[in-house]
Amino acid sequence: ITPATYHSRTYDRSRRLPNLLETLTRYGGVTEVDPITYTRVVVIISTDPEAPIEAHEIGCAAEIVKHIGGQSPAAEVLWAFGTEEGLGDEAELLVEWSY
């Protein structure tokens, strides 16, 4: 299993998920092994309970999942929204790749 955690670090609630997607597009990728060998990818997008995912963010969340899934097309992609105390207006992305 290869974990990766990204934080939005935007300090602007309206940009938290777009910033995660931009970060993934620029820097995130499968580099340690051939992505074809993965059988499952788990994606969790977390926000503070006081700043939950809003309706306008759903499309960006879907793009994040699509981007991650596209790196390993044969893998099953499971995803969910979660909560994490202390994130404030930021979002956290947890990605677990497994064989």
Identify what each model region corresponds to.
Residues 1-99:
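Tubulin/FtsZ superfamily GTPase core signature
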